[in-house]
Amino acid sequence: MELTVTQTTPDQLIERSNRLGADPRTTNYAGGNTSAKGEAIDPVTSQPTTLMWVKGSGGDLGTLTESGLAVLRLDRMRALVDVYPGVEREDEMVAAFDHCLFGTGGAAPSIDTAMHGLVDADHVDHLHPDSGIAIATSADGEVLTSTIFGDRVVWVPWRRPGFQLGLDIAEIKRANPQAIGCILGGHGITAWGDTSDECEANSLDIIRTAEAYITEHGKADPFGAVVDGNEPLPEAERRARAAALAPVIRGLASTDLRMVGHFTDSDVVLDFVAREKLQPLAALGTSCPDHFLRTKVSPMVLDLPGTASAEEMVTRLRELHAEYRTAYAAYYERNASPDSPAMRGADPAIVLVPGVGMFSFGKDKQTARVAGEFYVNAINVMRGAEALSTYAPIDESEKFRIEYWALEEAKLARLPKPKPLATKVALVTGSASGIGKAIATRLAAEGACVVIADLGLDRAQAAAAEIGGADVAVGVQVDVSDEDAVQSMVDAAALAFGGLDIVVNNAGMSLSKPLLETTVEDWDRQHDVMAKGSFLVSRAAAKVLIEQALGGDIVYISSKNSVFAGPNNIAYSATKADQAHQVRLLAAELGEHGIKVNGINPDGVVQGSGIFAGGWGASRA
């Protein structure tokens, strides 16, 4: 094995990783890992030393940078073979990798480090492509591997990731010098090469060959026929139904731990939830460790047709949720040992609704979105396996060993402490500028997902992008005096993040005129925006908060003018007094649902404000 002496080695590795990670057909978010071996000068001895650069624990191939690489001395890493205590204690080897690190900084080595270091090849890729996992989870995967690839790709029976799997693959590489890689049963693929380009080409060869074989030889309808009544609802009806269901489902999914939601109604999802094999395949659960660590072992599936009413769906979802929790607790009890970590929660991470789509949940928007993406990967895997054979994921006990793995628990324990408003969803009206934008910015900084609602869509979207992008903030257009527009705004919040927790009534305007110059039109316009608008927003939001059953907060940005009188602003001050009394009324009414209603009475805020339409801001500055 010839090794190169230059910075080119890690540079090429990063470029290869980014290309592979950019294609969802190749690997999923934060899944898989890549490596390269080469030489560098030891700064202590000034002698060349053989190193391995490998993607570190928790990194994502698509966005990998040099800081995300773990760098190990290859001789020390391979010397661990001599002290390996056996498969029953292989978890101890992860800590041993730290004693093989070269230099300072860099990422922590992952559980797959041994696979890369022990295989006798300069470059190694371990990936989770849909087509490769489809072969890996087929009941006759070993036969299919031989049929599709001949002796170029070798079958490796399922083994949990770790040091022993690295030894197994290294031996397979030695015994099969003609092979370019292997299919890992129930898991994914590994490929290798003498150069970075050759390794990447071999990875893509395995993936594309599997894709082509599935397309050419697979059954046309591997999920069976479309069930009558489960066809996708028309788009507008489907989105409205999803918005109505999302808060209910989010509340159920947050029984143990509050979650943020994500909704997906892609063609892949809608086709799967419409088919006759939906229930039996979903019950089998996912197989690839990266999949079920994000999605849990199986989803919750509504067993009603898409044509059922919203009320029927809600009633049945509540029943199914109770059943799911009982089943998950039983799964934990069946498989747990005295040393197992405590159960992390019995609620579903994925909920499938025929005719509507998929709801996914996580500790933040990104986690919820990625869980949904992983389940789409799982659907593709099931389709490929069923097209060629029968989908056969790894055993339940093996899934549990990974889901409640001590190493996985340790990784979770190392996560930073969540911010105060993590898992909360906030909606702020009039938040593209002024007080509203400042509030939205602070809420996001404290960990909340934020809906920026404003009369101008472009301004709302620009503010959302400035605050943090789609996994943190979304911009929506709303005229708070329009009942339908307000409902659309609340629906958008439900579709974006699953529901609401904090609602800030901030939208406003000011017409500063003496009594005798104030027209009926002025009065009506002022009250439409602030008094009526606050009422409409609070009413629509309260419905969501009550359905979620998670409590919540409604905050009114009123004004000192609601209390103190002054000349030349009767319309504005009267609406502020209206808002102040709405606070008192709603606090009394909504408290039984755990919903707190409060008001803030600030003085004039001019900087960055867009509410002053009549020159009042300039006169008060």
Question: Which stretches of residues belong to each language-model region?
Answer:
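Substrate-binding pocket helix/loop in short-chain dehydrogenase/reductase
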Residues: 514-515, 522-527
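Alpha-helical segment proximal to the catalytic Tyr-Lys
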Residues: 543, 588-589
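Glycine-rich flexible loops
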Residues: 1-426, 438
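Residue(s) in the substrate-gating loop at a strand-loop-helix junction
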Residues: 559
